[in-house]
Amino acid sequence: MATQRKIIHIDMDCFYAAIEMRENPALIGKPVAVGGSVEGRGVLTTCNYEARKFGLHSAMPTAQALKRCPNLILVPVNMPLYKAVSEQIHQIFRRYTDIVELLSLDEAYLDVTDCRQCSGSATWIAQEIRDAIWNELHLTASAGIAPLKFLAKIASDQNKPNGQFVISPENMTAFIYDLPLKKIPRVGKVTNEKLAQLGLHTCGDIQHSDKAFIYKTFGKFGQRLWEFSHAIDNRKIEANRPRKSLAVENTLPTDIWHLAEAEQIVDELFKKLVFRLQRNWGERSLQEFKKLAIKLKFGDFTQTTLERTTDGLSRERFIELLQQVWQRTNRRSVRLIGLSVHYPTEKVKKQLNLWE
């Protein structure tokens, strides 16, 4: 019998805002957001839990945030500091394992299957890591521990902030059976509503469904949905994996038929893409990102992707791609639009060097 894996998902608690409060204790207990401007331009990068009580969240327009929370304290982004602290956290991870998959500055998977520290207990390893982050860096982290990658990520959100949750091999089957499908990665509002219309609310419902029907109805994602609902997730923790691309997409509440509607959606997606690029990798000229792609998924769940090398990342270039790929609709409705960008080759190499 194969060895049961021990996977930990670590997620820092409102990372950027927490660092700012650590650096300036006068901010503690007050609603704080990182990013945006007092003039109301831009969007929030993140905010602390006091601000979230007012309904604030990352990527919210600053003007809207200030209306909801007039006393909101805005702090400028300090990416060099966040990166330095992130590297300190990564060094703590590597005291226990070299199999670390970095998802962003504040999130990572760890495979501790072969770790002998803490008598091999993944639960105690996660606790020690969180204790070290607090004692050495005065920041809090949440953790999820499970035999499967997707379950570890779900578990890290169960007792947030500053907590951890364990899904053991013994209780994994029961946990998955009752798990709401909206908790599955990539099941957004629209997909969840479609599932609900079919009477599918939990993984248990998927288990009692017809496999061919799930595959046909949800396409490639149907396979992932079926496998997760049956406790199948063979994805490895990809140590030292540099991110080669970044994508954003929007599954639409209702299908669209017209190019003008799609252009409006691309406008919003482009803003999100730039926001995420700046959040994860700091200030970098958009002209350095030359390999762009756009994806359309149609009402029949088939999809098409168009990729081009251009003179730089811009809204106009994505609109041009959209106009070209729209010719492939063949009178079909569109239910999803996605934008993606590949990092420059030297950027990928630099990430790899940092993580080696």
UniProtKB/Swiss-Prot annotation:
Disulfide bonds: none annotated. GO terms for cellular component: cytosol. It is found in: Cytoplasm. The keyword Magnesium applies. Its cofactor is Mg(2+). It catalyses: DNA(n) + a 2'-deoxyribonucleoside 5'-triphosphate = DNA(n+1) + diphosphate. Monomer. PANTHER family: DNA POLYMERASE KAPPA, DNA REPAIR POLYMERASE UMUC / TRANSFERASE FAMILY MEMBER. This is DNA polymerase IV.
